[in-house]
């Protein structure tokens, strides 16, 4: 479903202290945009309405987070959900940066100096048609870009409801010299301890769809 345009979204975002309107300006220097410059940096690609980031960020003040999506209409909802989570936990909101960015061009805002330690990819578009598969966030074309700014031993955490995307992504990771260190094809019955349920995850689970999850380590 296409989201209705919200003309008030960008002004609200630009008034937000943790929104970064022009992320390219910080390429290679992201650590210095955070209050605690010594924290490791984790990246969420396609943060959606921010459910995942709101929980992760507020639970882990010792980690800095970059959350990316493309539409202001989505980002403004993420902004509100993140603010709400921090307020409810009485936490200082100083370890999250929210920004608009086309993920296919992620290499225009991050480089090897940024030393990202973990990437989260949750329920991305599966792009099932062969001619579109290069658009997948787990495709080798993208993984090659991630390798540039992901530290050696850094991880990609990937969740999806889509069987074909999951199985083909296993091959993508192998081709790009990642080691699969954890894998389950039924996350909710796997015993995996710290799983933050996203809005898409909840919807798919209610439909009886098993959630696939893996952790891939950069070699």
Curated annotation (Swiss-Prot):
Q: In which pathway does it act?
A: tRNA modification; N(7)-methylguanine-tRNA biosynthesis
Q: Which domain of life is it from?
A: Bacteria
Catalytic activity as recorded in UniProt: guanosine(46) in tRNA + S-adenosyl-L-methionine = N(7)-methylguanosine(46) in tRNA + S-adenosyl-L-homocysteine
Enzyme category, top tier: transferase
Give the keywords, sorted.
Methyltransferase, S-adenosyl-L-methionine, Transferase, tRNA processing
Looking up CDD domains in the UniProt record yields: AdoMet_MTases
Q: Supply the EC number(s).
A: 2.1.1.33
State the GO CC annotations: tRNA methyltransferase complex
Where along this sequence does the record place binding of S-adenosyl-L-methionine? 44, 69, 102, 125
Which residues are substrate-binding?
A: 129, 161
Which GO terms of the molecular function aspect are on file? tRNA (guanine(46)-N7)-methyltransferase activity
User: Which family does the UniProt entry place this protein in?
Assistant: Belongs to the class I-like SAM-binding methyltransferase superfamily. TrmB family.
Q: What is its biological role?
A: Catalyzes the formation of N(7)-methylguanine at position 46 (m7G46) in tRNA.
HAMAP family referenced in this protein's UniProt entry, alphabetically? tRNA_methyltr_TrmB
The UniProt entry, under NCBIfam families, shows:
PRK00121.2-2, tRNA (guanosine(46)-N7)-methyltransferase TrmB
- Name under which the protein is recorded: tRNA (guanine-N(7)-)-methyltransferase
Q: Tell me the gene name.
A: trmB
């Amino acid at each position: 479903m296409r989201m209705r345009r919200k003309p008030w979204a960008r002004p609200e975002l630009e008034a937000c202290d943790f929104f970064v309107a022009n992320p390219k300006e910080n390429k290679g220097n992201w650590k210095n945009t955070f209050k605690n410059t010594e924290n490791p940096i984790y990246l969420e690609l396609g943060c959606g309405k921010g459910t995942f980031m709101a929980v992760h960020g507020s639970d882990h003040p010792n980690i800095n987070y970059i959350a990316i999506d493309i539409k202001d209409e989505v980002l403004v909802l993420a902004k509100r959900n993140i603010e709400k989570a921090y307020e409810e936990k009485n936490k200082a909101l100083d370890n999250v940066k929210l920004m608009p960015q086309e993920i296919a061009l992620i290499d225009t805002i991050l480089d090897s100096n940024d030393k990202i330690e973990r990437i989260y990819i949750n329920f991305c578009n599966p792009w099932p048609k062969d001619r579109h598969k290069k658009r997948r966030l787990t495709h080798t074309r993208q993984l090659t870009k991630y390798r540039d700014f992901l530290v050696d031993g850094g991880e990609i955490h990937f969740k999806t409801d889509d069987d074909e995307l999951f199985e083909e992504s296993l091959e993508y990771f192998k081709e790009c010299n990642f080691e699969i260190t954890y894998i389950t094809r039924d996350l909710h019955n796997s015993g995996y301890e710290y799983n933050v349920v996203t809005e898409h995850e909840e919807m798919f689970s209610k439909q009886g769809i098993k959630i696939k999850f893996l952790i891939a380590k950069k070699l």
